[in-house]
Amino acid sequence: MDMISLKSPREIECMRRAGRLTAQARALAGSMVRPGVTTHEMGTAVRRFIESHGAKPSFLGYGGFPGSACISVNDVVIHGIPGPLKLKEGDIVSVDVGAFLDGFHGDCAATFACGQVSDEAMHLIHVTEQSFWEGIKLARSGNRVYDISHAVQQYVEANGCSVVRDFVGHGVGAKLHEPPEVPNFGPAGHGPRLQPGMTIAVEPMVCAGDWRVKVLRDGWTTVSADGSLTAHYENTILITDGEPEVLTRVED
């Protein structure tokens, strides 16, 4: 089994730069969410932005993925392939972005409202994002990975939604996906112990209905099995001696 990598101060600084660029790309894509824009246009803008800063889109070609970002609309939870789909009023749009810079990856996601959306959709977006913040309250040295997982699940389910079981968060570093896995469900007190220098992507994937999902025939697009709305929120974080540090953030 691969070891969990603990990052050196130099590596952490590289990950801050990669994370900042990734967060900026997420914000750029989010700013484009409006009726009439295609997911292809959003993906192209992400690629141009990342490449203009001397970096590479982490997802492009990863496992054969054809896009530079995952743009997932409504019942698509994750891995939506950018294409001709035009956004319309009332859609909710998840943007998942990765950037590879100076030998390290950043990985982050958020779900955006397209114009006026339903109360159910706004509730789902809020619950998904807030569950991330609830989870990382437990992302402290000495705690265990599943302490985060349990906190995410508890918050989501207390608010009438469900967490996807088939896909999970993960370590991030020189590779886009590293150990450990970081589920959004499970019993507290289990999993690897968190240590300073660990860098992990915590990414609640949440359904308004049942948690079960299915992958479409393209091999990527993953939708809620019951057709319910879905949302996704993710940041790459650093475990420290104190509070966790969010690496995928746009500097103030």
Identify the function of each model-found stretch.
Residues M1-D252:
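Active-site neighborhoods and metal-handling regions in enzymes and metal-associated proteins
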